[in-house]
Amino acid sequence: MTDISERNKLILEAIIEDYITTAEPVGSRAVTKRHGLTLSPATVRNVMADLEEMGYLVSPHTSAGRVPTDKAYRLYVDSLLAVRRIDKVERERIRKRYAEAGRDIGAVLHETSRLLSSVSHYTGIVLAPRFSATIFRHIEFVKLGGRRILVILVADNGTVQNRLIESDEEFSSEELIRMSNYLNELLVGVPVGQVRTRILEEMRNEKVLYDKLLARALQLSEQSLNDDGAQIFIEGQTNILEQPEFADSRRMRDLFRAFEEKNQLVGLLDRCLNAQGVQIFIGAETHLSQMEGLSIITSTYLTGKNTLGVLGVIGPTRMGYAKVIPIVDYTAKLVSRLLEGE
């Protein structure tokens, strides 16, 4: 950014930090008084007018003060922000929460969304690992009523998915056990994304052609793996509704719609899967119209070098970036260690 002088950056930083704290449009007198600048209010006023012309500030109709734009927050995050470390007490509090969550991956991820919400005071969000990105460990068919079968799928990272399927014919419990044993022997250690290929290869096997039960086992397993819908955990939506900029009913409605239409959020989080480290989307950068006025800070969590999913915090564009960025970063690293069994 070469279009803004150091003095103007200093004043813009002061305005942004005041607005983050107060949620009120910031005037020139407040900037000089709160930040001890050796500049007159008139000089600051002129700078604010310049910053508005450059697209960093806007003037609400009802106020003489100014409000930062998405462009201002982007400059703030990229160039002006001093990110602080999480203090020892906060780190211990986060680790203790995970100790209470146990080792079940679903419980860990659900607790992560709650923790991110409670520590940041905004909304915590976690995209669970896609089953197709894991390694197959175990499948079990459980007979329910009629032709309904509960399929329990287990991945090498501990992810468990339960799926209900309707079979074309009825099987006994003994037949389902034999089918499960056959598939477990065939598929253990195979990447889930390659399971269908392995199944199609096996269907050409002469043994399968003459064993109807094995053929049906392969068909059932393919049916079971057909749905790889994303699982997303969201906690603390009401924290955003308590922010003054979301007080009017239209903004509130849009916000609820954004959280209800999870496919759009999943699409945004999917974009983060190929990026390492913390990602920050400010306002319009999310490309989600219903998330106007919101920012999202995310980071991937991993096992080894394999990206499993994404976690993060959604808050107003005036969120406390200096506090939230290290929380998201630390939590992602801690979740990665937990899932690796450290």
From Swiss-Prot:
It holds the Pfam family HrcA_DNA-bdg. The keyword tRNA processing does not apply. Keywords: Repressor, Stress response, Transcription, Transcription regulation. GO terms for molecular function: DNA binding. One of its GO terms (biological process) is negative regulation of DNA-templated transcription. Disulfide bonds: none annotated. It comes from the Bacteria. Belongs to the HrcA family. Negative regulator of class I heat shock genes (grpE-dnaK-dnaJ and groELS operons). Prevents heat-shock induction of these operons. This is Heat-inducible transcription repressor HrcA. It comes from Geobacter sulfurreducens (strain ATCC 51573 / DSM 12127 / PCA). The gene is hrcA.
